[in-house]
Design a protein with these regions (language model features):
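Polyanion-binding surfaces on beta-sheet-dominated domains and ring/shell assemblies
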Residues: 1-120
Length: 120
């Protein structure tokens, strides 16, 4: 991870300690931080439901920064509720909302350069 670039991005988007969660192996920007970045860059996101079932959902997000409307990014978010984390990746029954949240986060992080630095 390029620490200098990461510090530069934190300052650019005015991220505070409560906007970031440091996991043992990686850094996670909280929902509050994601929305702060989205607002600052004026990122527009539309969603397409690819699959939505009782315990599984996939959303496709199309996103762009308003100052660069020709650069459209497409990415996905998914959530699977299973018996445990070995079989799934979500511990709640609101899998559609989790898939949407994951698609949103991934799109914002990719458009702003965080994702390539290992921030999720």
């Amino acid at each position: 991870m390029n620490r200098e670039k990461l510090v530069e991005l934190y300052k650019k988007y005015d991220l505070q300690k409560d906007d970031v969660y440091k996991h043992q192996h990686y850094v996670i920007i909280t929902r509050q931080g994601i929305e702060k970045i989205q607002a600052k860059e004026n990122i527009t996101i539309t969603y397409e439901v690819v699959k939505c079932e009782t315990n599984f959902a996939v959303f496709k997000a199309k996103a762009f920064i308003s100052s660069k409307p020709d650069t459209v990014l497409e990415t996905f978010g998914s959530a699977l509720k299973a018996a445990n984390y070995k079989d799934g990746n979500c511990n709640s029954w609101y899998v559609a909302e989790m898939a949407e949240k994951r698609a949103l986060s991934r799109a914002v992080l990719k458009l702003t350069g965080f994702y390539e630095l290992g921030v999720f």
